[in-house]
Swiss-Prot record:
Function: Regulates the dendritic spine distribution of CTTN/cortactin in hippocampal neurons, and thus controls dendritic spinogenesis and dendritic spine maintenance. Associates with the striatin-interacting phosphatase and kinase (STRIPAK) core complex to regulate dendritic spine distribution of the STRIPAK complex in hippocampal neurons.
Domain of life of the native organism: Eukaryota
Record's compositionally biased regions (Acidic residues): 861-880
Protein name: Cortactin-binding protein 2
Gene name of this polypeptide: CTTNBP2
Upper classification of the organism: Eukaryota, Metazoa, Chordata, Craniata, Vertebrata
Length: 1647
C-alpha cells in the first residue's frame, strides 16, 4: 500500500499541472502584446522582472537540492536506515534495465524541462521587448517633429500678421492714388469736351468745304460731260463726213470708169465695130446695182436663181404660187449672190394652239419687206427670209405662230445630183471662197450669223452618224446651189408653168430616180394627180396640224449615186410648206409594212426641178409622236435629229420612268398607217402591225391613247358619246392622251369640255400623268384649263412630286410658275425636294430652290420651252450666286418617316452636286440626326464627307512677302512685294500642329515648284541646266509669319483653335516674311529676283574678299539691282558687327571725268591722305553704267592703288580744283561697278585683270533660268497657288515668251552682234492673262518695236557700215546707210521675227497673221536673202566678229570652196526666181500682192546692192545660212513646219546655197580646234588672246577664269548642240571651234 501511495503521488500532482498548463495555453493564445497600453507594458515588465528574480532563486534552490539528491542517490542507497531506499534498490536489481521503470519522476528531467521552457519564454519576451523599444523610439521622433512643426506654425503666423499690416498700408496708398487719378480723369474729361467742341467746329468747316468742293466737282463733271458730248458729236460728224467722202470718192471712181468706158464705146462706135461690147455696160451696171447695199431709202433688189436644190420664189402674192423663173445664164454680178442653205433661221415648229383646217389652200411664201431683206457680205440673198403666214386664224386665247421657212431648203438626198465643177479662173473670188467654205466646213455660221444648231431636246439622242448625215446634207445643198454659178447646169430645167406639187400618197419621195429603196416606188416628175374631194367629216371643222408621216429615205453619205444603203426615217414639220423641212434620222427602224394609201386632200408635195429628192411629206398621220420641243428654233439639217417612234407605252398606272425609258423609240404600240379613204375605221385601226389595246372598250379611248386626231375629232362630233367614260383602271380618254403626250388630242378633249381633274383608281389625274411622263405641252394645256396643280394622289404624290421624281424640268418650271405648293408631303413624308435629290437631278433641285413664281398670273407662250433651257443653263447658275433660295429652311430640313432629310439622301447616294446645292442654303442643318441617331456626315460617302468637312472651312491665302522693294532706280519695277503661293483650308478640327505642318509643307512645295523644271521642258536640250536650278530657299529662310496682324512662329500654339483664332482676329491672309538685307541675309533678294541664294552669297563673298568687283552682262541683266541689294546686305552686316557703314552711289555718263571720280573718292573717305590715319568707317562705292565711259581713261590711274591698299604705295591725284596730293585707298572701302555690255574692247581690256569680274551671261546661271522661274512664280500667283496643267494655253504662252528670249539671243549671237543681246529684265513684264494669249502677243509686238528692233537695227548697221579695207587707216561709220545696208537690216529683222519671235506662237495662224502687221520689219521678202550672193571679196580679210559671248561662239571666217566658188562670186544676184514657201493657205491675196510689190521693189534695187565691205557680205551669208538651216541647235531645234515657220530654199541654179544640213552633234577631234596650220587659209585673230603678261592685249572676250584655259580643248569634244559651239562649213564637213578668252595669241601673230 505504501508503494501504491508513493507511486500515486506524482500522478495526483501531475493532473493539476496539466490543467493549469492547458489554461495557460488558452490564456496565451488570447494574450496579445501589441494591444497592451504603455502602463500595462510597464506592469508586465515589472512582473517579468520579478519572475526572473524568482526563477533565479528557484534555480539556486534546485541546484542545492540536486546536489543533495545526487549525493543521496550515489551514496544513500547503502543507508540501512531508510526502508524505502532498500525497496527501491531491490526493485531495480530484480529485473533488467529496459524493463524497469523508475518508481518516481527524476527531478533532473523535470528541472531541465522547466529550464527549457523558461529559455523559450525569455527569448519571446526579448523580442517583444525589442519591438516595444522600437515603437517607443518612433513615437519620440514623431513628438520631436510635431514640436518643430508647431514652432514653424508660430513663425508663419507671425509673418502673416506682419504682411497683413504691410498690405493695409499699401491699400491705403492705393486708395489715395485712386482719388488723385479720379481727379485727373475729371480734368481730362473737361479737356476732352473742349477738344470735341473744337472738333465739331472743324467738322462744320470741313463739311462746308466738302459741299463747296462737291459743287465744284459737279460743275466740272457737267463741263466734262458737255465736252464729251461735243467730242462724240464731232467724232460722229467726222466719221459721217469720212464715210460721205469715201462714198463720193467711190462714186467719182465709178463715174470715171463710166466715162472711160463711154469714151471707148464712142470710139468703137466711130470705128464701126459690132454692137456686142456695148451690151455689156447695162448688164454690168445692173450687176453693180445688185451688189450694192440697200439703204433705207432704196428698195431691195433681189434676183431669183433656180438651181437643182432650191425653189426660186418671187413675188408678193399671198394667195397663188408664182411660177419658177429660170435665168438663162447667171452673170458674174449675180454669182455673188448668197445661196447659203441656212440663210434664214428656220423655225418650223408645231403650232400647238392654232388649228389648220384646209391644208390644200396653203398660201405661197412671199418676199419679206424691204427692211427684212438683209443683203449680206457676199451679195443679195435669193429670197432668204420668206414669211409663210398661217392660212387659218389661231385658236382663241392662243398666240399664233407664223412658221418661217427658208427659200433654199435643206438637201433632200445624201448624194448631190451633180458633181460641182472646179472654180473657173474667170469666176468671182467670193463665189469660189463660198464654195470652198461650205465644202470644207459644215458648222460655219450662216449669213445671218446664226449657227444651225437645234436646241437641246430631252428625247433626242443623236449619234455621230446622224450628225454627219445632217451636215453632209447641208453641205451638198450649198455645193449644188453654188454649182449653178460656177459650172454648167446639169439636167433639164423644170417647166415654168408646172406647179411644184406631186403625187405623194402611194409614192413616198426618194432621193433620185436611180436610188433604190425597198418597198417604195419612184417619184415621177409630171403634173400632180387630181385632188380627191374632202371627207365629209372634216370639210367644215378646222382640224389641228397633223402629226408627221414616216417616210423612208436614203440619207447615207455614199458618194456614188444609186448605192443601196440603210433606211433612215425622215419626217417633215406639221405644215404643208415645201421649205423649212427637218431631216429626222433614226438608226434601227424596221422595214415599213404599213399599207400604201392614196393621198389625202391636204398633201402638198414639192418635187425638186433637176431630180433632187423632196424632203418630206406634210400630211396627217395616225399614231405619230409629236415633236418634243415645239416652238424651238430647229433649222433644217439640224445636228439634233428628232426620232419618230414606232410604239407608244401604255399602262394602267403611272410608274416612274427614266428619261431614256420615256423616249418614243422605247414604247410598246403605235399605229403607223395614215388615215385616208378606208371605208371602215375599225379594220384601218387594226391593220398595219399594232396590237389591239386591252381593256379599252371604246374607240374614243383608243384614238386618244394612240394620238389619232382624225378619228378622235370624228368621234367627238358624234352625239351621245360620253367623253368622260373611264375604263376599269379609271383611265379616261383625257388621261390616256395626256399620259402619251398627244397634245392635239388633249386640246380637242379639253375643248369638248372633258373633266380635267378626273382621277383614276390610284388618284392620278391627267396632269399627274403628263407631269410624270414629261409631256410639258400637255401640262401647259391642262394648267391653262384650270387643272388642279396641287392634287395629291392616294399616296400623296402631287404633279410637282412626279415631275421631280422623273427629272422633267420643263414640267417643273411650268408647275412652279403656276404657283404649285412645294411643301406637300407624301405618305412616307417625302417632299418634292426629296424626290429631286433621290434621282440626283441637279436641274430639278435648282428649279425647286431658286425658281420664283411670277407675281401676276402665268403668261404661257410658245417660246417658253426655249426659255426653259436657257433659264436652266444660264439663269439659274447666275441666280445661285446672286439671288437667295425661295425654299424655307423647314422644307430643306424636313425629315421623312425614317428621319432622313434631303441631305441624308444626297450624302448616302453620293450625289455631291445635289449636296453642294443643299449646303448653299443657309438654313441647312447638317447635324440633324435621323431615328438611328445618324447625322448627314455619318451616312455620307467619301466624296460627300469631304464636302461636308470643308463646308465651314476657312480659305486663307498664304502669301510670301519680301518687304518693300524700291522700284524704278534699280531695275526692280517688275518685282512683286507679295506672292500668293496657295490657299490654306482651316477647319474647325484643325489643330495648331496641323496648321504648322500645312504652312511648312506649302512653303517647301512652293520653293521646289518654282525651282524644278516641271513642265518647262523646252525642245532644246542644251538649255536644260538642272544642276543650278534650285534657288536654295527653305524654311530657314523665313523670318516671321503673320496671321493677319498677329505674329506667329511655326510650332506656336494659342489657346484658341486656328479656326476660332482666324475668325476672331479677322485674319484674311497668312503672310510669310523672308529674311532680307536688313537681317544680313539674302533670302528675300533671292525670292524677289529668282537668283539662286548660293550665287548671291558667292557674290557677297567676292565683294567682302576682293573689295573690287564689277558685274557685267547684256543690258537688262539686273546688274544694278544685284549690286544695290548686295550693298544693303553688306551694310547691315557691318553695322551688326559694330561698324558704321555708308553707301555712295554714282551714275556714270559720257561726261563723267576722272577728276569727278577723284572728288567722289575723297569726299566719301575712300581716298585718304598719306599723313592721315585710316578711318574705321566702312564705305561702299557703287559705280553704275560704266559702259558709258572709257574704263581705261576713268579707272586707269586707280588700278595700282586699288590693288595695293596701304600708305606704303601712295599715288598722287589731282583734284577738281587743280590741286594734287598723295592719297591711298584704305582697307574699309568696297568698290562695285556695273557694265551693261557683254564684252570689252581695245584699251578697256587692260582694266579687267585688276578687278574681280562677275559675268552675267544670258546662256548661263543665274540669268538663264531666272526668266523661267520668275514667270512660273508669276503664274502661280495669278492662279492663287494652283499651277495649271502643261496643256493650258497660258502655259504655252509663257513657254513661247521664254523661247522668244532664248532664240532671239541665240540668233543675235550667231549674227555676231553681241551688243544687241538682251537680259531677262525686259521680259519680266510678260502679262499672264488666262485665256487671252492675244494680250501677250500685243505686249511682244510693243517690246519688239520699242526695244528689240531698234537695238537690232543699230547693231546690224554698225556692223555692216564698218569698213576695214587696207586703204583706210581707221574705222569709219556711215551716217546715212546705203540701200544695200538697209536691205540687210530689213532682212535681219524679218529673219529674227520669223525664226525667234513668231515661231512657236500659241495663237492660231489666222490670228497670228492679224498681229504680224504690228511687228516692225515683218513684210520683207526673205527670198531675196536666200538668192543673194555676195560679190568677190578677199580671202585674207580681217575678221569682223570682234567679240562674242553667246552660246554660238564664232570661229574665224573660213574661206572654204563652198563659200568662194568663182561661178558664184560672178553670178551676183542674177537668179531672181522667188521661192517663197509660205504654205499658209489662209493668206489673203492682198498680202501676197503687197509682198510681190515689195519684192519687185527690192529686185529693182539689186544692181545697186554692191556692198561696200566684206562685213555686209558676211552678214548676207550668215542670214542665208540662217534661212536655209533647219537643224539649228541654238534656236531650240526649230521644227520644219510650213505652217509655223516660213522656210526659204535657194533655187537650183545656185548650188552654193543649197541647204547643206550638217549634223550638229558630230563629235569633233582635237585637231580641228588646234591653231590653224599654214595650209588653212583662215585667219582667227579675233579668237586669240595672250596668256603671257608681257604681250599687249589687242582683242579679247570678257573674262574667263584662267583655271578654265586647260579645259577648253576638252570641251570642244562635246557635241555641237552645246551652248559653246557653232556650225561652220569646210568642204561640206561639220567642224567647230571653241572660242576661249585666253588662247595663245602668238598663233595669230604668226599667221
Amino acid at each position: 500500500m505504501a508503494t501504491d501511495g508513493a507511486s500515486c503521488e506524482p500522478d495526483a500532482s501531475r493532473a493539476p499541472e496539466e490543467a493549469a498548463g492547458a489554461t495557460a495555453e488558452a490564456a496565451r493564445k488570447e494574450f496579445d502584446v501589441d494591444t497592451l497600453s504603455k502602463s500595462e507594458l510597464r506592469m508586465l515588465l515589472s512582473v517579468m522582472e520579478g519572475e526572473l528574480e524568482a526563477r533565479d532563486l528557484v534555480i539556486e534552490a534546485l541546484r542545492a537540492r540536486r546536489k543533495e539528491v545526487f549525493i543521496q542517490e550515489r551514496y544513500g542507497r547503502f543507508n540501512l536506515n531508510d526502508p524505502f531506499l532498500a525497496l527501491q534498490r531491490d526493485y531495480e536489481a530484480g529485473a533488467g534495465d529496459k524493463e524497469k521503470k523508475p518508481v518516481c519522476t527524476n527531478p533532473l528531467s523535470i528541472l531541465e524541462a522547466v529550464m527549457a521552457h523558461c529559455r523559450k519564454m525569455q527569448e519571446r519576451m526579448a523580442t517583444q521587448l525589442a519591438a516595444a523599444e522600437s515603437r517607443q523610439k518612433k513615437l519620440e521622433m514623431e513628438k520631436l517633429q510635431l514640436q518643430a512643426l508647431e514652432q514653424e506654425h508660430k513663425k508663419l503666423a507671425a509673418r502673416l500678421e506682419e504682411e497683413r499690416g504691410k498690405n493695409k498700408q499699401v491699400v491705403l496708398m492705393l486708395v489715395k492714388e485712386c482719388k488723385q487719378l479720379s481727379g485727373k480723369v475729371i480734368e481730362e474729361a473737361q479737356k476732352l469736351e473742349e477738344a470735341m467742341a473744337k472738333l465739331e467746329e472743324e467738322k462744320k468747316k470741313t463739311n462746308e468745304l466738302e459741299e463747296e468742293l462737291s459743287a465744284e466737282k459737279r460743275r466740272s463733271t457737267e463741263m466734262e460731260a458737255q465736252m464729251e458730248k461735243q467730242l462724240s458729236e464731232f467724232d460722229t460728224e467726222r466719221e459721217q463726213l469720212r464715210a460721205k467722202l469715201n462714198r463720193e470718192e467711190a462714186h467719182t471712181t465709178d463715174l470715171k470708169e463710166e466715162i472711160d468706158k463711154m469714151k471707148k464705146m464712142i470710139e468703137q462706135l466711130k470705128r464701126g465695130s459690132d454692137s456686142k461690147p456695148s451690151l455689156s455696160l447695162p448688164r454690168k451696171t445692173k450687176d453693180r446695182r445688185l451688189v450694192s447695199i440697200s439703204v433705207g431709202t432704196e428698195g431691195p433688189l433681189t434676183r431669183s436663181v433656180a438651181c437643182q436644190t432650191d425653189l426660186a420664189i418671187e413675188g408678193t402674192d399671198h394667195v397663188k404660187k408664182s411660177p419658177l423663173t429660170v435665168p438663162g445664164k447667171p452673170s458674174p454680178g449675180s454669182a455673188k449672190g448668197s445661196v447659203c442653205a441656212n440663210a434664214a433661221h428656220v423655225r418650223p415648229g408645231m403650232d400647238r394652239q392654232a388649228s389648220h383646217g384646209d391644208l390644200t389652200g396653203s398660201s405661197a411664201p412671199s418676199l419679206p419687206p424691204a427692211s427684212a431683206n438683209r443683203i449680206e457680205e457676199n451679195g443679195p440673198s435669193t429670197g432668204s427670209t420668206a414669211d409663210l403666214p398661217s392660212s387659218t386664224a389661231p385658236a382663241p386665247g392662243s398666240a399664233a405662230q407664223s412658221p418661217v421657212a427658208a427659200a433654199l431648203g435643206p438637201a433632200h438626198s445624201a448624194q448631190s445630183p451633180c458633181t460641182p465643177a472646179p472654180a473657173q479662173p474667170g469666176l468671182n473670188p467670193r463665189v469660189q471662197a463660198a464654195r470652198f467654205r461650205f465644202q470644207g466646213n459644215a458648222n460655219d455660221p450662216d449669213q445671218n450669223g446664226n449657227t444651225t444648231q437645234s436646241p437641246p431636246s430631252r428625247d433626242v439622242s443623236p449619234t455621230s452618224r446622224d450628225n454627219l448625215v445632217a451636215k453632209q446634207l447641208a453641205r451638198n445643198t450649198v455645193t449644188q446651189a453654188l454649182s449653178r454659178f460656177t459650172s454648167p447646169a446639169v439636167g433639164a430645167a423644170p417647166r415654168p408653168g408646172a406647179p411644184p406639187t406631186g403625187d405623194a400618197g402611194a409614192y413616198p419621195p426618194v432621193g433620185r430616180t436611180s436610188l433604190k429603196t425597198p418597198g417604195v416606188a419612184r417619184v415621177d416628175r409630171g403634173n400632180p394627180p387630181p385632188i380627191p374631194p374632202k371627207k365629209p367629216g372634216l370639210s367644215q371643222t378646222p382640224s389641228p396640224p397633223h402629226p408627221q408621216l414616216k417616210v423612208i429615205m436614203d440619207s447615207s453619205r455614199a458618194s456614188n449615186a444609186g448605192a443601196k444603203v440603210d433606211n433612215k426615217t425622215v419626217a417633215s414639220p406639221p405644215s404643208s410648206l415645201p421649205q423649212g423641212n427637218r431631216v429626222i434620222s433614226e438608226e434601227n427602224l424596221p422595214k415599213s409594212s404599213s399599207p400604201q394609201l392614196p393621198p389625202k386632200p391636204s398633201i402638198d408635195l414639192t418635187v425638186a426641178p433637176a431630180g433632187c429628192a423632196v424632203s418630206a411629206l406634210a400630211t396627217s398621220q395616225v399614231g405619230a409622236w409629236p415633236a418634243e420641243t415645239p416652238g424651238l428654233n430647229q433649222p433644217a439639217c439640224s445636228d439634233s435629229s428628232l426620232v419618230i417612234p414606232t410604239t407608244t407605252a401604255f399602262r394602267s398606272s403611272i410608274n416612274p420612268v427614266s428619261a431614256s425609258s420615256c423616249r418614243p423609240g422605247a414604247s410598246d404600240s403605235l399605229l403607223v398607217t395614215a388615215s385616208g379613204w378606208s371605208p371602215s375605221l375599225t379594220p384601218l385601226l387594226m391593220s398595219g402591225g399594232p396590237a389591239p389595246l386591252a381593256g379599252r372598250p371604246t374607240l374614243l379611248q383608243q384614238a386618244a391613247a394612240q394620238g389619232n386626231v382624225t378619228l378622235l375629232s370624228m368621234l367627238l362630233n358624234e352625239e351621245g358619246l360620253d367623253i368622260n367614260y373611264s375604263c376599269e383602271d379609271g383611265h379616261s380618254a383625257l388621261y390616256s392622251a395626256a399620259k402619251n403626250g398627244h397634245t392635239d388630242c388633249v386640246r380637242l378633249l379639253l375643248n369638248a369640255e372633258a373633266q380635267v381633274n378626273a382621277a383614276d383608281k390610284n388618284g392620278f389625274t391627267p396632269l399627274c400623268a403628263a407631269a410624270a411622263q414629261g409631256h410639258f405641252e400637255c401640262v401647259e394645256l391642262l394648267i391653262a384649263y384650270d387643272a388642279n396643280i396641287n392634287h395629291a394622289a392616294d399616296g400623296g404624290q402631287t404633279p410637282l412630286y412626279l415631275a421631280c421624281k422623273n427629272g422633267n424640268k420643263e414640267c417643273i418650271k411650268l408647275l412652279l410658275e403656276a404657283g404649285t405648293d412645294r411643301s406637300v408631303k407624301t405618305r412616307d413624308g417625302w417632299t418634292p425636294v426629296h424626290a429631286a435629290v433621290d434621282t440626283g437631278n441637279v436641274d430639278s433641285l435648282k428649279l425647286l430652290m431658286y425658281h420664283r413664281a411670277p407675281a401676276h398670273g402665268n403668261s404661257l407662250n410658245e417660246e417658253e420651252p426655249e426659255s426653259d433651257v436657257s433659264d436652266l443653263d444660264d439663269g439659274e447658275e447666275s441666280s445661285e450666286g446672286e439671288s437667295k433660295p425661295v425654299v424655307p429652311a423647314d422644307l430643306i430640313n424636313h425629315a421623312d418617316r425614317e428621319g432622313w432629310t434631303a441631305a441624308h439622301i444626297a450624302a448616302s447616294k453620293g450625289f455631291k452636286n445635289c449636296l453642294e446645292i443643299l449646303c448653299r442654303h443657309r438654313g441647312l442643318e447638317p447635324e440633324r440626326r435621323d431615328k438611328c441617331n445618324r447625322t448627314v456626315h455619318d451616312v455620307a460617302t467619301d466624296d460627300c464627307k469631304h464636302l461636308l468637312e470643308n463646308l465651314n472651312a476657312l480659305k486663307i491665302p498664304l502669301r510670301i512677302s519680301v518687304g518693300e522693294i524700291q522700284s524704278g532706280n534699280y531695275g526692280s519695277s517688275d518685282f512683286e512685294c507679295e506672292n500668293t503661293i496657295c490657299v490654306l483650308h482651316i477647319r474647325k478640327q484643325t489643330s495648331w500642329d496641323d496648321f504648322s505642318k500645312a504652312v511648312s509643307q506649302a512653303l517647301t512645295n512652293h520653293f521646289q515648284a518654282i525651282s524644278s523644271d516641271g513642265w518647262w521642258s523646252l525642245e532644246d536640250t542644251a538649255f536644260n541646266n538642272t544642276a543650278d536650278s534650285d534657288i536654295g530657299l527653305s524654311l530657314d529662310s523665313v523670318r516671321a509669319i503673320m496671321l493677319g496682324s498677329v505674329p506667329w512662329s511655326a510650332g506656336q500654339s494659342f489657346t484658341q483653335s486656328p479656326w476660332d483664332f482666324m475668325r476672331k482676329n479677322k485674319a484674311e491672309q497668312v503672310t510669310v516674311l523672308l529674311s532680307g538685307p536688313q537681317e544680313g541675309c539674302l533670302s528675300s533678294v533671292a525670292y524677289a529676283s529668282m537668283i539662286p541664294l548660293q550665287m548671291l552669297q558667292n557674290y557677297l563673298r567676292l565683294v567682302e574678299q576682293y573689295h573690287n568687283v564689277i558685274f557685267h552682262g547684256p543690258e537688262g541683266s539686273l546688274q544694278d539691282y544685284i549690286v544695290h541689294q548686295l550693298a544693303l546686305c553688306l551694310k547691315h552686316r557691318q553695322m551688326a558687327a559694330g561698324f558704321s557703314c555708308e553707301i555712295v552711289r554714282a551714275e556714270v555718263d559720257a561726261g563723267f571725268s576722272k577728276e569727278q571720280l577723284v572728288d567722289l573718292f575723297i569726299s566719301s573717305a575712300c581716298l585718304i591722305p598719306v599723313k592721315q590715319s585710316p578711318v574705321k568707317k566702312k564705305i561702299i562705292i557703287i559705280l553704275e553704267n560704266l559702259e558709258k565711259s572709257s574704263l581705261s581713261e576713268l579707272l586707269g590711274d586707280f588700278l595700282a592703288p586699288l590693288e595695293i591698299r596701304s600708305p606704303e604705295s601712295p599715288c598722287t591725284f589731282q583734284k577738281g580744283n587743280g590741286t594734287s596730293e598723295c592719297y591711298y585707298f584704305h582697307e574699309n572701302c568696297f568698290l562695285m561697278g556695273t557694265i551693261a555690255k557683254a564684252c570689252l574692247q581695245g584699251a578697256d581690256l587692260l582694266v579687267q585683270q585688276h578687278f574681280r569680274w562677275v559675268q552675267l551671261r544670258w546662256d548661263g546661271e543665274p540669268m538663264h533660268g531666272l526668266l523661267q522661274r520668275f514667270l512660273r512664280r508669276k503664274l502661280v500667283n495669278k492662279f492663287r497657288g494652283q499651277a495649271p496643267s502643261p496643256c493650258d494655253p497660258v502655259c504655252k504662252t509663257i513657254d513661247w515668251a521664254l523661247s522668244v528670249w532664248r532664240q532671239l539671243n541665240s540668233c543675235l549671237a550667231r549674227l555676231g552682234t553681241p551688243e544687241a543681246l538682251l537680259g531677262p529684265k525686259y521680259f519680266l513684264s510678260c502679262p499672264v492673262v488666262p485665256g487671252h494669249a492675244q494680250a501677250t502677243v500685243k505686249w511682244m509686238s510693243k517690246l519688239w518695236n520699242a526695244v528689240i528692233a531698234p537695238r537690232v537695227q543699230e547693231a546690224i548697221l554698225s556692223r555692216a557700215s564698218v569698213k576695214r579695207q587696207p586703204g583706210f587707216g581707221q574705222t569709219t561709220t556711215k551716217k546715212h546707210p546705203s540701200q544695200g545696208q538697209q536691205a540687210v537690216v530689213k532682212a535681219a529683222l524679218s529673219i529674227l521675227l520669223n525664226k525667234a519671235v513668231l515661231h512657236g506662237c500659241p495663237l492660231p495662224r489666222a490670228e497670228l497673221d492679224q498681229h504680224t502687221a504690228d511687228f516692225k520689219g515683218g513684210s520683207f521678202p526673205l527670198s531675196l536673202v536666200s538668192n543673194y550672193n555676195s560679190c568677190s571679196k578677199k580671202k585674207e580679210n580681217g575678221a569682223w566678229r570682234k567679240v562674242n559671248t553667246s552660246p554660238r561662239r564664232k570661229s574665224g571666217r573660213f574661206s572654204s570652196p563652198t563659200w568662194n566658188k568663182p561661178d558664184l562670186s560672178n553670178e551676183g544676184i542674177k537668179n531672181k526666181t522667188i521661192s517663197q514657201l509660205n504654205c499658209n493657205k489662209n493668206a489673203s491675196l492682198s498680202k501676197q500682192k503687197s509682198l510681190e510689190n515689195d519684192l519687185s521693189l527690192m529686185l529693182n534695187l539689186d544692181p545697186r546692192l554692191s556692198l561696200g565691205s566684206d562685213d555686209e557680205a558676211d552678214l548676207v551669208k550668215e542670214l542665208q545660212s540662217m534661212c536655209s538651216s533647219k537643224s539649228e541647235s541654238d534656236i531650240s531645234k526649230i521644227a520644219d513646219s510650213r505652217d509655223d515657220l516660213r522656210t526659204f530654199d535657194s533655187s537650183g541654179n545656185n548650188p552654193a546655197f543649197s541647204a547643206t544640213v550638217n549634223n550638229p552633234r558630230m563629235p569633233v577631234s582635237q585637231k580641228e580646234v588646234s591653231p590653224l596650220s599654214s595650209h588653212q587659209t583662215t585667219e582667227c585673230s579675233n579668237n586669240k588672246s595672250k596668256t603671257e603678261p608681257g604681250v599687249s592685249r589687242v582683242k579679247s572676250f570678257l573674262p574667263v577664269p584662267r583655271s578654265k584655259v586647260t579645259q577648253c580643248s576638252q570641251n570642244t569634244k562635246r557635241s555641237s548642240s552645246s551652248s559653246n559651239t557653232r556650225q561652220i562649213e569646210i568642204n561640206n564637213n561639220s567642224k567647230e571651234e571653241n572660242w576661249n578668252l585666253h588662247k595663245n595669241e602668238q598663233t595669230h601673230r604668226k599667221t
